[in-house]
From Swiss-Prot:
Homotetramer. SUPFAM superfamilies: NAD(P)-binding Rossmann-fold domains. One of its GO terms (molecular function) is identical protein binding. The gene is fabI. Catalyzes the reduction of a carbon-carbon double bond in an enoyl moiety that is covalently linked to an acyl carrier protein (ACP). Involved in the elongation cycle of fatty acid which are used in the lipid metabolism. Pathway: Lipid metabolism; fatty acid biosynthesis. The lineage of its organism: Bacteria, Pseudomonadati, Pseudomonadota, Alphaproteobacteria, Hyphomicrobiales. This is Enoyl-[acyl-carrier-protein] reductase [NADH] FabI. Belongs to the short-chain dehydrogenases/reductases (SDR) family. FabI subfamily. It comes from Rhizobium meliloti (Ensifer meliloti).
Length: 55
C-alpha cells in the first residue's frame, strides 16, 4: 500500500512518538509512515524484540 504524495510538508519541524507498533499492518505503523511522509521526525516503540524484523 502506498501513501498518497502530499506536496506540503504539513508536519515539518514537528516531533512525534508512535507507540505499540506490532507489525507492518498495524495502525501505529501506518501512522508512522504517514507522519514521516508529511515531514515529522518520529520516535517509535514496538511490541518486543520478536517484532523488530517486522517493523
Amino acid at each position: 500500500m502506498s501513501i498518497p504524495t502530499v506536496k506540503a510538508k504539513l508536519l515539518q519541524g514537528r516531533k512525534g512518538l508512535i507507540v505499540g507498533i506490532a507489525n507492518d499492518r498495524s495502525i501505529a505503523w501506518g501512522r508512522a509512515r504517514a507522519f514521516r511522509a508529511l515531514g515529522a521526525e518520529i520516535a517509535v516503540t514496538y511490541l518486543n524484540d520478536k517484532a523488530l524484523p517486522l517493523v
